[in-house]
Design a protein with these regions (language model features):
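Glycine-enriched, solvent-exposed interface loops adjoining structured elements
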Residues: 1-226
């Protein structure tokens, strides 16, 4: 699988620029490219699941890690083995109106994005409750050495290499002020992104399965023209 070293060599060979100054800039090219990919892709490969203990002490501001970009889903179980309950997403204003007294407790029903680094859950749970948060997150940063926040390979390098490579070339070409070639890499990047978006759509298609109610029983869902 392609890793940081592979990508670095590929960039140097493609640009035919083996200068020390260029090599020093490569980590910055990669960082900017990864940020671009996270914004341009809607891919299940970016999804992460995190379990967080929620209680009266933090229900008003449940922390999210700094790589979270989108909160997709929040659910919980009252105790082990019980049915999973999905919380409904609402605005902060709605949550505050619905449950104005945070000291009061009840069964969690709603969540809202409070800031870029936290969500609010209401009602405040009666006791500590484990909540599973599904998020679209920035993968750990690709770098030459491993650590708590970096890795030599990640989802982009392993499954989206062409898009990552062309995105890096856009940054490299901007750095070298090669305006004519810049349009070539931008075009190649868009082609790679469209391919990945099509792949993402294919993961969500139902392959012509008959629409049915998730609750089971008689089918209450009808399709247009049926």
């Amino acid at each position: 699988m392609p890793d940081y070293a592979f990508l670095k060599t590929d960039l140097i060979n493609t640009t035919e620029n083996d200068s020390t100054e260029f090599a020093t800039q490569i980590p910055f090219f990669i960082t900017k490219a990864e940020f671009r990919l996270t914004k341009d892709l809607d891919d299940v490969g970016l999804d992460e699941y995190t379990n967080v203990s929620v209680s009266s002490g933090n229900a008003g501001a449940v922390p999210l890690n700094d790589r979270v970009r989108i909160v997709r889903n929040v659910n919980f179980k009252v105790s082990t083995g019980t049915t999973v309950t999905n919380l409904l997403q609402r605005t902060v204003e709605y949550a505050n109106d619905y449950w104005p007294v945070s000291a009061s407790t009840g069964t969690p029903r709603y969540y809202s994005r409070r800031t870029n680094s936290s969500i609010k859950i209401v009602p405040t749970p009666v006791s500590a409750t484990t909540v599973e948060i599904q998020t679209a997150s920035q993968p750990l940063a690709l770098a030459s050495a491993t650590g708590t926040s970096v890795t030599t390979s990640n989802y982009f390098s392993e499954y989206c290499y062409n898009a990552l490579f062309y995105s890096c070339l856009i940054e490299a070409t901007l750095y070298m002020k090669d305006w004519e070639t810049l349009q070539v890499w931008r075009s190649e990047y868009q082609n790679a992104i469209q391919t990945l978006r099509n792949q993402a759509r294919r993961t969500r298609q139902d392959d012509m399965e008959v629409a049915a109610s998730p609750a089971g029983g008689p089918n209450t869902i009808t399709q247009a023209g049926s």
